[in-house]
Every structure is written in C-alpha cells, then in structure tokens.
Amino acid sequence: MISNLLKMLSYPFMQRALVVGILVSLCAALLGVSLVLKRYSMIGDGLSHVGFGSLAIATALGFAPLAFTIPVVVLAAFLLLRMNESSKIKGDAAIGLISSSALAIGVITVSWSSGMNTDVNNYMFGSIIAMSDEDVVLSVVLSIVVLILFVLYYNRIFAVTFDETFAKATGVRAEFYNMLLAFLTAITTVLGMRMMGALLISSLLIFPALTSMRLCHTFQSVVICSAVLSVVCFLLGMSLSFFLSSPAGATVVIVNLLAFLIFSAIARIREHTA
C-alpha cells in the first residue's frame, strides 16, 4: 500500500493535482459554510455554468481560458447578488436564469467550433491531472489570496452570515462583505471547475459544510471541521481515482457523499442515545 502511494506521488501531474486540489478544497469548504447558512449554496452551480459558457467562448477565440473566465464569472456573481437584493427575481430563480442562459451560450459555441471539444470537456467534467504549469501557478496564487482574505475578514463574514440586519445596525458594511463573499466564491468556482468540472463543482461547496453541521454546533467549529473534512475527502478521492482509474472529480464527490451519509448516521445515533 505504501509503495503504491509513493508511486502515485512520484508522478509530476499528481503532485500538481494534489497541491491545487488541497488549496481549492480548503477555499470551497470555508466559503461553503457561509453560503449554506445564507441559503445561497447553489450559487456555485450557477457560476460554474457561467464559467463553462465563458470558457467555451475563450477557447473558440483563442484567449487564455482562466484569464478570460475569471472576470466574467466575478461579474456574474455580482449580478446575481444585485438581483437577489434589489430585483423581483430572487435567489434560485436568478441563479437558474443566468446559469441556463450561460450554459446555452456555451453549448452553441462548442457546436459551432471545431477542435475544442477536448478542452471544453475537461472543464465540463473535470481533468485536474491535465492542468498546465500556468494553470497551476495561477490556481495556487488565487487560492492563497482567497484564503488570506477569508481569514482577514472572518469576523465580518461571520456577522453577515448569521444576522445581516444586526450586522448593519452595528456598523458592518454588509453589502461590501456580501460582495466579497460573492467575489471569493466566483474565484473558487472557476478554479474548482478544472478539478471537479462544471457539473460537480457545487459539491465542494455544499458537502463538507453540510457534513460538518451534523457534527458541530458553532460557526468556528463547523468551519474548521469543514476544512479538514474537505481536504481529507479530496485526498481519499484522488487516491481512489488513481488506483481505480476512475474520474477524479466524480470520485471525490462520491467520497464526500459517503462521508455525509456516515456522519449523518452517527449524528442520528447520538441524538437517540442522548
């Protein structure tokens, strides 16, 4: 077993995948707690569809995929936030409207273009082992920026997560921190698409947070548990993917699902025995 793990770690593409995957998993887990508590967890799914559409356009036009997609997805995140706050189109309806439109644009772009199916499929279904050195550097830098900003503004994010009205009354600029949360989520979603794919990235935001809430009862403990659980599930999923020759993103999701089911069962047993 040890020799197989060492063999896995000896491949440069696996080393890159693990470094990027751990950082993105951490970012997604930390942000996911706030998104789930604010009942906005599906924003990752909506933004990933926007990301797919913009990636298809970037590939067709010969632009750098991540450099083109990140600003587009950030703008979409701000638009979703603005629609949710001031428009008659709220929450899940706004996400569905924007995500389905962006996905349709992406599909049409792919159908009109030739020679780009492989690149687009990598972002649709995930292919972390196919990341270029430039993708790795950009992903690492942006992931570190996301983590630093989350830690720096942790108390403010906590305040707007639990009681936005009270936070405003105490002088917290709730709109700014909601925009910061949307910005960080957009960055994490784009980075996670390379690893998980547009169809599965929302699982990185949702599963660790939901699982941790079955075990912990304070915001801080849920955040810490979610971060640890997300990294552990990613490492287990990547290892199983390597040994079973299964898709990396899908395997990570299955491991997260199993963790959720196991810890939900444990929490239910604890409730009945308490």
Where are these regions (language model features)?
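Loop-to-transmembrane alpha-helix initiation sites
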Residues: A17-V20, P65-V73, D92, G96, ...
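Transmembrane alpha-helical segments in multi-pass inner-membrane proteins
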Residues: M195, L199-A250
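Transmembrane helix-bundle core of multi-pass membrane transporters
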Residues: I2-R16, S87, I95-N155
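C-terminal binding/interaction regions
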Residues: N4-S10, M124, I128, L229-I266
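Short loop segments and helix-boundary regions at transmembrane helix junctions
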Residues: V33-M116, S212-I224, S241-F243, A267-I269
